[in-house]
């Protein structure tokens, strides 16, 4: 029997809803960024970034793998992850979403893999794609710097989305 990988990319609004729907929260270091730091390649993004909810949070806390946080702290962590341009990846479980990893394209294994091999749909799914309003784009290139999978390029001083590479993270 096939075991499906139901990892999904979640926009900020959906992660906010997941947080609102839960009452137990835990946060742990991003294992990908932690490994990179140990190997001497420290990432400048948020380290304590992976959240678990409900019984998964209980398990992580009880086993010393994460610390308990409040709902308000979970909301603040999401805001910080968003400010850092991190991609909100959820694991899917028949009981609901139990984990959110806030991933960077430079150190997180799944995002680095899909970027290196140009395979965005292989590992990550989303129902969204980035969009650019050509009339309001100022050509500041902030979006190209924030895109964790390098799916935004500048064309004639206007941001252009490479839809084959976009994973719809926001």
Regions found by a protein language model. Name each.
Residues 1-112:
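Iron-sulfur-associated redox domains of electron-transfer enzymes in respiratory
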Residues 89-95, 117-146, 150-168:
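Ferredoxin-like iron-sulfur electron-transfer modules
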Residues 107-117, 167-170:
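Repeat-unit-sized solenoid/scaffold elements
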